[in-house]
Amino acid sequence: MKLTLNRDSMFHLANRLRAEHGPSYVIDQLYGKACAVNKNSIIESIRTTGEIASLRGKGRFYLFAVDADPRLRYERIQLRKSETDAVSFDLFLENEKRESVSADPGVPNLRACIGAADFLFVNNGSKTELYQQVDVILSTLDFPVQ
């Protein structure tokens, strides 16, 4: 059976994988791939508290959250023209609401993930402004930037 490539199908597939294999299954697979490269790595789209707990247990891990005004985030996803982002603003907001809060560590809870971040970047400006925020934080961390 072929899945339709959209945010909804990806949401349900990831939730099913976490339900079947544990709340950190998806992120643990990505972590394994990152370790195989043997360099500093960035894993994006951490969405559950179970994923955060797993990564925190592995050692040198920093959680960066990037947030922006919902309208601006919507405009940006429309510009990238991804198949998974072809939604109305109302559906975008519904998806955000669905992924914002959950007591289940294997289900997206973006508000808790943002709250658990070591560093929060507000991305309401330009890329240059975001990069400047990130550079300031990276310069304070105890590992070489590659």
Residues of each region from the PLM?
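Short, hydrophobic alpha-helical segments
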Residues: A34, N38, I137-V145
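ATP-dependent NMP and nucleoside kinases share a basic, alpha-helical "lid"
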Residues: G32-E83
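Small-molecule kinase domains that catalyze NTP-dependent phosphoryl transfer to phosphate-bearing small molecules
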Residues: S24, R80-Q133, I137-T140
